[in-house]
Amino acid sequence: MVVFGEDVQAKIRANNRNWDARAPIHARSRFYGIGDRDPMSWFAPFEWRDLGRLDGREVVHLQCHLGVETMAFALKGARVTGLDFSCVCVREAQRVAREAGLTIDYVHADVYGAVEALGAERFDIVYTGKGALCYLPDLTEWAQTTARLLKPGGFLYLVEFHPLLNALGPIQRPGETRDLVIRRDYLGGRGAVERDSTHTYTDGPALASDTLHYEWSHGVGEVVTALAEAGFSLGRLTETCLLPWQRWPAMVRTQHGWWTMSPSEPRFPLIYGLKASKPTRLK
C-alpha cells in the first residue's frame, strides 16, 4: 500500500471529513432521489453493453458513496461489494440497501488499501468512476491496486467525467455571455486544487463544517498510461455527450432520461467509459 507524504495525507483526511459531512445531506437530497429513482437510471445505455451479463459475477464498486449505482449490480444478479473511505457514506449505503431489500457487502476502506481490506484476485469486475478519480492523487498506484483486485481474465470498467467537463466553468461571470469557457485545468501535474464551499453538487442544506476539500486533475492520457503500465489490455473506449443530470441550462433531457447539450450547441464529450482487462496469464 502506498504511503503518501504528510501534505497529501492531510488533503486526503480533509476530503474524508468533507465526505462524512456530505453523506447525510446527499442521502436525503432530491438529486439522488433515494427510494424514488431507479438505480438503473444512473447508467448510460452503453455501460450495460460493455459490462455484459452480471448474474453470479463478483463485482466491486470502488468509491461507491451512497451505493445508488452499487444497487443496480445487485439487481442484475451480481454478488456485490461496495468500498468507500467515508464511514458515514458506508453507513448510509448500508441503510439504503437494507431498506431496498438488497444484499450488498459494504466495506469502509481507502482505495489504496482495497487489496488489504478485500483480498487479492477476488473479483470478476471492478467498477468505478463518475467523480471518483479526482479524489485520487496517484493513478499509478490506483491502477496497480485495481489489477491486484481482479481475477485473471477479469476487467476494470471505468466510467468517468471527461476532463473537459471538469475544465469547463459552470458559472457565468458578470458581463460574460452564456458560452462555456475553460476555467480549470484539463491536464494534471500541478498538484491538488483546493475548494471550499458550504454547498455541494446536490440540493439540501449547507454543510455545517468540514467544507474544505481537494481535487486532482487527470487527463485521459494519464489514465490510459497508468492502466497500460499496470498490465491491463485496453479495450473499448467510449466518449459520450450525455450526463445523468443537468449541468448547464442549455442541456435538454434525452429519451433515456439523461441530459445532453441542445441540438443548436456543439457536441463535445462529457463522460467517457473505458474497459480494461487483466490478462489471463502474465507475460
Regions found by a protein language model. Give the residues of each.
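A short SAM/SAH-binding and catalytic strip from SAM-dependent methyltransferases
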Residues: 124-140
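Class I SAM-dependent methyltransferase SAM/SAH-binding core
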Residues: 57-116
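Conserved alpha-helix/loop element of class I SAM-dependent methyltransferases that forms part
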Residues: 31-58
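Conserved class I S-adenosyl-L-methionine
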Residues: 155-200
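A short glycine-rich, Lys/Arg-flanked "PGG" loop and its adjoining helix->strand segment in the class I
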Residues: 140-155
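Short alpha-helix
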Residues: 214-237
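A short acidic, Gly/Pro-enriched loop at the edge of an enzyme's catalytic core
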Residues: 116-126
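N-terminal, positively charged/glycine-rich alpha-helical extensions of SAM-dependent methyltransferases
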Residues: 1-37
